[in-house]
Amino acid sequence: MFKKLSYLAIFLSSAFIYAQEEEEVVVTGSYIAGSPTDGASPVEIVGRDLIDNIGAMTASDITANLPIDSGSENNADSFTSGATQGRTNINLRGLGLTSTLVLIDGRRVTFSGSIANDGSAFVDTSQIPTIALDRVEILKEGAASIYGSDAVAGVVNYIFRRDFVGFETDITRQQIEAGSARDDRVSFIYGGEFGDSNVVLAYSSLDRSPMLGTEKELAPMGISGLGTSFRLLSGTTTAAAGHPYAGTYTHNPNGLTDPPNTYIRDPNCVANKGIVLADGRCGFKFGPRFNIVNEENHEQIYLSIKRPLTDEIDFNLDVLDATTNVWDNPQSPSYPALTFLSLAKLIQPGTGGSPFDKALLWYGRPLANLFPSPLAPRYISRDRISLGLTGTFDNGFDWDFRVTRSAEDAYGLQPDTGTSQLEDAIAGKGGPTGDQTFDLFIPTNNSQELIDWLRSDQETWTDVELEVVDFVVTGEVGNVAIATGIQLREESIDIDRSANSLVVLDANGNLVTPANMIFLGGGIEVDTSKSAEAIFVEASADINENLEIRGALRYESLEEESTVDPKISLRYQASDNVVLRASVSQSYREPTLAQLYASDVGLEGIQDYNTNGETVGNATFIRIAAKANPNLVPEEADNLNVGVIWTLDDFQAKFDYWAVDYTNVITKEQAQGIVRYTPQSTKVIRTSGTLAGVTTSYFNADYVETDGIDIELTYSADIGPGTLGLGLNATHMMSYDIPILGVKTDVVGLFNQDNFARSMPDTKAVISANYLSGQHSVAAYVRHISSYKTNAALNSTAQSLGIFNADGSIDSFTTVDMQYTYAVDAENVALTVGLKNAFDEDVPYVYDATNWSYDPKHHDPRGRMFTLGLKYMLD
């Protein structure tokens, strides 16, 4: 197939050999020269000035300035985004991380090796060095007819400063007021011309110090009932005098109505930094142990070389190398012993340090409140190289050939305790010598040697790679502008695991042999690949001096499927001041390799329910098995956009109505929804009546139907000695309909903890003002996220805290950023001072089981931040 399409590309290029010459100016969403930003397709451009004015330390700061983004993962979140620590992403219209196509200089980039909790794959935007950015172009509609798979919600194109000439260096510190956490960034960019060659080199390094969970109370619900407790199942038992547990305990035959006589908790629970729960257990408060911001280092190197090879052919090379190290990422001292919540694993008298004369069921963890937190580091290395040739045929028709390879190598460690080691140690056969006993009742009696021997860390090595060949020809035939070309893609994923974290699944994806870990679930190893070949054609013509029509068609051949995706758009100049535009298109997204083949077991905080819909106990972290599904079919979407652009002198207004009808949506079953709505399902795993796990799988959901409105207002005027700029950028979601238990349900304005949609406030907006006068520049940005709500009923613990709104509402969140820059012309120096979240607005509280009690996918928890930057420039 690759060879056939290569021959076809040569034929297509020769077919237009007599076309007329026209200089190429390309905007994201089209390959045709001359596509304007006020054209038929809605494109938002974040320019270099705006990147500087918002004080963007990283690409995620740019994402935070985009109201169209909804539900991305750009804040550290050990509870619901643990596997993706150190990475960032973008989620246009809340349609899913995988439904936004991310490009670098118009070319594809490999997905990250780690996936989000909901199974979404994404391009890691943390690899982008902001100093090397010229602009970011955001296409706000589907574009599969041009770019292929994944361009359902839109396209985000990071365009680098490939023509930069000069030298610029920047040193910036961003200090969080609450605590000692800060970001220190050092970066530079150099561009020079050497004969006919142009070379650009950029480097950026960001060191981020941690913001500890103790510095802000953002996880008050981070309490586990599996701390230091045991359960007596029948009769009476006695512990001898002299032992901390000394006394007689009697089973309550009426259940748990008299907890002290049913659960036997650590008698020194509070003194040992535990927390006594309502049912009598000694709980473990893990929330403050996790960082709000991790200690990280990010480094990026970018190189661009351009030079002519002949009078007709130019050579260009782009190289990007990026590394991320998450150094700390503290966890609980040990995780709950889920594998011991079984009648087959009762703690017998005389074992595990038990002072009792009857067997007990262990509700705990090997190491709890008195022990330090182990670390779960992440190391990520990415490289991208793009080699291109561009030229012009003798008649002036342009061609562009490029080969791009991008890859990511990642390593992650998650500490845990070995099931087999712990069983041996409880039986008195533990440690290097095989004769040590682990004391479950007085953990401080255990030696460090034995504690170290119990460790069974989950280690994962992930390699992903994407190779893309693009060949595009553009020009004109008569009065019709045409672009056509081919694309060849090959994608691979290789996941290796430590032996203790491997699981065995049967043919149906059910767990046969678990990992040798008491809590973490492990997974299978994967080494697979897939390829795709595509051909497309795009055309544009002026029907008259006021009406332009564009059309595109792309055929893409996948390994199991094929798809044809059309698009047609219109631009009508209704008057000197008014432009009308409209577009309709079809888009698709193919399943990712991880969704097809990479079954694994993760962790989620889940609230249990009974068949009456009532909560049972407190939420706790349990194993969530996610079964891959090789039978997934591609998603398909119909996209519509209708807009008007009104320009009057220095004022411009853009209003766009958009709609996406999505079918065969690929998602993972939502574990909380399964437990809440079908608590007796075979997918819900219980051990001795205690919720222990949920089995989920990837599937093609019926549909998502969503629509909304985008608004962009800009105004500029000369006022006094300078220029004033004002702006409003807002997105309002009118509906987001999905099936819940077979019923079409609008989930806009909901937290959506029990379905596959992400949290979804209906309105996000940014109001901006900047004033430039000589050497002085002042900018201010007001960011608003509307209120929304959760439909989860508060449990007794949440009610007792008194911090959550009783009706489930989540307050709106509005922050103000301000920045002042003074340019010292004679010294080529610029000094910048700034405030982010200037009024120190607290994030609104969100009741979300045992996770963070705020929404990391929308709200930045860091509070007020001070910024000081120094920039030096040479032409």
Language model features with spans:
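N-terminal periplasmic "start-of-domain" segments of outer-membrane beta-barrel proteins
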Residues: 24-54, 60, 112-117
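N-terminal periplasmic accessory domains that precede
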Residues: 59-62, 90-91, 123-126, 150-171, ...
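C-terminal beta-signal and terminal closure region of outer-membrane beta-barrel proteins
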Residues: 413-415, 421, 585, 602, ...
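Gram-negative outer-membrane beta-barrel transporters
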Residues: 657-794, 871
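Short acidic/polar hinge/loop motifs at secondary-structure boundaries
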Residues: 107-140
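Extracytoplasmic beta-strand/coil segments of soluble accessory domains associated
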Residues: 35, 64-108
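C-terminal beta-signal and adjacent terminal beta-strands/loops
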Residues: 734-735, 784-796, 821-875
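Surface-exposed, low-complexity loop segments enriched in small/polar and acidic residues
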Residues: 117, 222-224, 262, 266-296, ...
